[in-house]
Amino acid sequence: MNKEEKTIAIYSAATDLKPLTVSFNNTILGINPWSQEVNVLHMYGGFNGFAYDAGTDEETGKPLMYCQVKYDLIQSLANPKVFVYKGDVLPRTKSTDKYGKTNAGWVNFCTLRYANNGWFVGSTADAERDKRNGYKEVEAGKIEGAVVGQSHNRYAYFLIPEGCNYVVVDIENNTVLFDIK
């Protein structure tokens, strides 16, 4: 559905949109490359003080260490490459990174809940592994560019705007929207 053009696309089973399959190095499992169909995105970062759910990953049996299910972005029924969070206002906990930089509400999005070396959707902020994290201020209601993969983008975060309770991540067009609904 395209609200701007006021159009709706209907797909048949033959032309159904398919989820994105990504490949990356999974050093926790020692499987390189690891392939995974993206069917959920997890919020990762200091936004919630790095809180995580207890338990183990169903697929691997590895302990969960990085994310809380209540902040997961759910795959859209209309397009399997679009993920949506609609819920409580997101926390904006102030956290200091390992380089001494303090920000409130920093977040990016990942495919794994047991490792920080998965496939990520990060901001366009300048970041470099083992040198610096990057942080991008965003406005509610404004679509932002994103960088996907398993490179320096894992260290590039969005700063959640005040009052945000709605997030859309589009991994087909590499965009992120934070909003208040």
Task: Show where each model-derived region lies.
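Structured interaction patches on ligand/partner-binding surfaces of diverse proteins
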Residues: M1-K18, N116-F178
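Short, conserved beta-strand segments of beta-strand-rich sandwich/propeller modules, principally
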Residues: W106-N108
